Regions:
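Hydrophobic, well-ordered secondary-structure scaffolds
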Residues: 8-16, 20-27, 181-191, 199-211
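Structural motif
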Residues: 79-85, 114, 196, 242-248, ...
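Low-complexity, acidic/Ser/Thr- and charged residue-rich accessory regions of DNA metabolism proteins
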Residues: 271-351
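Phosphate- and other anionic-substrate recognition elements at nucleic-acid/protein interfaces
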Residues: 1-150, 351
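Short helix-capping/linker segments at secondary-structure and domain boundaries
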Residues: 97-102, 210-213, 258-267, 321-332
Length: 351
């Protein structure tokens, strides 16, 4: 089947298409790539292509799907293609995949619209911060403190706010209204124990997309930066190296867990205490059943707390993956765990 594999090159991240068919491939970029895509769009429903990307909010795939092009995807785990191959070799390998391993591409225009609003909001915030800092630097360079700013400088800084609120306030309302309509956002808020609509679920869902593209929960963990590298450590960004995980998703999750702990979130806090207690038990002695080795680090509380945070994140992500995967389970393992912890807490108080 005609296969598309895309990579980005250069500082400008120009998209490069590797198109394969019958075991041979060609590299297209710039005007040639656009002309080839226009040709595929013109044929419409007569075209059938296989994409190595299954992202439901991919602009290129959404445009092709809108024109009626039949798009299929295949999980990397099911086809057994090594991700370390050259781009052209990856496209050739996917073009030979059996039809039984293919699955229809799911286009999510609602998530794409949400993603656009989130990106716009983030850009406005960065612009406001940049301009405000530049104006404040005027006072720093002239040696004037904030309480002695001249009137014109105060007016310029205040102009970045509307009705006493940041300029992104209206965008926040639009993002929240959009998130209310998307089932994944509602599910995220419920599983993470969040009462009110916030920007958090919109940020996470808009960068993760439809979870059906992940064959296992481990794939979702990996995409969100919750996996362990070959050297046994958490993943980190490296200069000049491409990431196979999403830094934005990991940042959103870390902030969500951190805020939940500070606010005594009814879901996050009990789970954290439960996992931290288990980590403290096995920190010095290890665990023969799981093969965990004893740890003799000097920062026992901090180490166990960090491991507990990671376990909470992975557990909640697992529940989110199950809930959005169409299983229809109402009473999850997480809910049972929370009920058991609450019962234990009531018993301990009574004693």
């Amino acid at each position: 089947m005609l296969t598309i594999h895309r990579k980005y090159s250069g500082v400008a991240k120009e998209p490069v298409l590797y198109v394969a068919d019958n075991g041979t491939h060609q590299e297209l970029k710039g005007a040639k790539a656009r002309a080839w895509l226009d040709k595929i769009c013109a044929t419409g429903k007569q075209s059938r292509i296989l994409s190595t990307s299954a992202c439901s909010i991919d602009d290129m795939l959404l445009a092709l799907a809108e024109r009626g092009v039949q798009i299929f995807t295949a999980h990397w785990h099911s086809v057994g293609v090594d991700k370390k191959l050259e781009p052209g070799e990856i496209a050739e390998a996917f073009s030979k995949v059996a039809d039984s391993a293919l699955r229809p591409y799911i286009a999510r225009t609602d998530l794409a619209a949400l993603r656009g609003r989130v990106i716009t909001r983030n850009a406005v915030i960065e612009y406001r911060k940049s301009v405000a800092n530049s104006l404040r630097n005027v006072g720093l360079r002239t040696g004037v403190s904030a309480d002695r700013y001249p009137k014109w400088l105060k007016e310029e800084i205040e102009a970045l706010r509307t009705d006493g609120k940041p300029v992104e306030y209206d965008l926040d309302k639009q993002v929240k209204a959009e998130a209310e309509k998307i089932p994944e956002c509602v599910t995220f808020r419920r599983i993470f124990g969040m009462k009110d609509v916030s920007i958090v679920e919109a940020q996470f869902v808009s960068c993760v997309g439809d979870t059906s593209r992940f064959p296992t929960v481990g794939s979702l963990w990996h995409y969100c930066g919750q996996h362990v590298t070959d050297d046994g450590k958490a993943p980190h960004r490296k200069r000049g190296a491409a990431n196979d995980w999403n830094p934005e998703a990991r940042t959103v999750l870390w902030n969500t867990i951190d805020t939940g702990l500070k606010a005594n979130n009814p879901v996050i806090r009990p789970l954290y205490e439960y996992y931290k207690a288990k980590e403290l038990e096995t920190h010095d002695a290890g665990n023969a059943e799981t093969g965990k080795k004893p740890c003799k680090c000097e920062t026992k509380q901090g180490h166990c707390g960090a491991r507990a945070r990671r376990r909470v994140t992975k557990e909640l992500l697992k529940q989110y993956y199950v809930a959005t995967g169409g299983t229809g389970q109402q009473r999850t393992v997480l809910q049972s765990t929370i009920c058991r912890l609450e019962s234990m807490r009531r018993v301990s108080k009574a004693a």
